[in-house]
Regions:
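Auxiliary Fe-S-binding modules of radical SAM enzymes
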Residues: 67, 73-152
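Core AdoMet radical
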Residues: 1-20, 24-70, 81-97
Length: 152
């Protein structure tokens, strides 16, 4: 593997990671981050423990599209995750992303000093009981303007 390139390996199939790692993986490589995607609490509780059991120098997880509030404190407390990313549903989806869910993740990551990136609002964003329909071109910009990434 090229040591001059950083690789980000992302999957929702956490249970297949271990068997697909190279034979010389050992405790991971300095330039490879393993990332598992989840959508909600159920999937986080299903997939994150699997990633925790896999040796890797760098780990992250993404909640996208976020479909419900997620409490991930017990995973952050392991000190194995360097980054959490979150995004609302986009493309043809219309399931809402709630500001309160994002704020909760932000606060959890801040408490454990884990980088949090709110990468996009999704098509439907709800804040203060008001629903916003946000065109794809503005979803990332609106997420950045929210001030909910950590550190900001």
């Amino acid at each position: 593997i090229r040591s001059d390139v950083n690789f980000w390996i992302q999957t929702k199939r956490a249970d297949s990671i271990q068997q697909r790692l190279p034979v010389d993986w050992n405790y991971g490589w300095e330039n490879v981050t393993l990332c598992v995607t989840t959508e909600n609490q159920r999937r986080a509780d299903e997939r994150l423990p699997i990633l925790l059991d896999i040796p890797a120098k760098h780990k992250a997880f993404m909640i996208a599209p976020i479909l419900s509030e997620a409490h991930v404190e017990k995973y952050l407390a392991t000190n194995q995750f360097e980054q959490v990313l979150c995004d609302g549903e986009n493309y043809d989806g219309d399931r809402p992303c709630y500001y309160e869910w994002i704020k909760s993740l932000h606060d959890q990551c801040k408490e454990y000093d884990v980088t949090f990136n709110f990468t996009g609002t999704g098509n439907v964003f709800v804040k203060d009981k008001k629903t916003y329909h946000i065109p794809k071109a503005y979803q990332r910009v609106q997420a950045q303007r929210s001030g909910l990434s950590y550190p900001s």
